[in-house]
Amino acid sequence: LFPEQLTYIINHAENQYLFIDLSFVELVESLESDLEGVKGYVILTDKDNMPDTKLNNAMCYEDLISGESEEFDWPEFDENTASSLCYTSGTTGNPKGVLYSHRSTILHAWIVSSGNVAKVSSSSCILPVVPMFHVNAWGIPYAGAMFGAKLVFPGPALDGASVYELIDNEKPDLLMGVPTVWLGLLQHLNETNQTLDCVETALVGGSAAPRAMIQEFEEKHDVFLMHGWGMTEMSPLGTATSRTKEMEDM
């Protein structure tokens, strides 16, 4: 997104507090004068790594939660209550906001976890190489939490070597990300003669994966590359190419 689009989204959504990754602090500083209703900024770090920022009323995340109780009484409310607001990208004109309910989020998590899609269970280990700002990381953090799966979140380094190091250390069986991430991973695997012994499925979205990449995952690493398609308006998953008996017999 362009800076002008980010400014539009923040103002249109009437955001009051922004949670910012360290890598975006300078960008938000350049936008602050145009942000109409923002009261403060929470930078996702601890006190030792807090940057010297020009942002008004900025605090680090660890300070924010340090004074809060570890106990939380979850309130009762209608399932159609709003849970999150995601904005489209790549559409004509300004981004459009899509408001999700708690009901739609839970139903989407059930669908993503089903046997014909991600097959999420309490024994799963999932590495979503896709950020929450990309349509709630395709809903997989909710699905993983719902079924008690292990979730492994990458940092800002998404090069092939860094992604492989996470895979080697944490042993995920399910990966999720856009094709460019998997191309970088395959390049690293070829250069270092490594394999993906623990991985069963890699879900790819955002754009179509090249046929050669699909074949290389399957033939060299025995990893099924599953295509997912959807839109922001669909929470976002609409359909996925699950492995069929006919495919296995080919």
What are these model-predicted stretches?
Residues 1-63, 77:
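Structural core segment of the AMP-binding/adenylate-forming
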Residues 1-8, 22-27, 149-170, 180:
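ATP-dependent adenylate-forming carboxylate-activation enzymes
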Residues 5, 26-30, 162, 184-185, ...:
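Phosphate- and divalent-cation-binding pockets in alpha/beta enzyme and binding domains
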Residues 18, 82, 88-91, 126, ...:
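Conserved S/T- and glycine-rich ATP-binding loop of Class I adenylate-forming
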Residues 68-81, 85-127, 139, 149, ...:
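Conserved adenylate-forming
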Residues 106-125, 135-174, 188:
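Conserved AMP-binding/adenylation subdomain of ANL enzymes
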Residues 146-149, 172-177, 186-250:
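Gly/Ser/Thr-rich phosphate-binding loop
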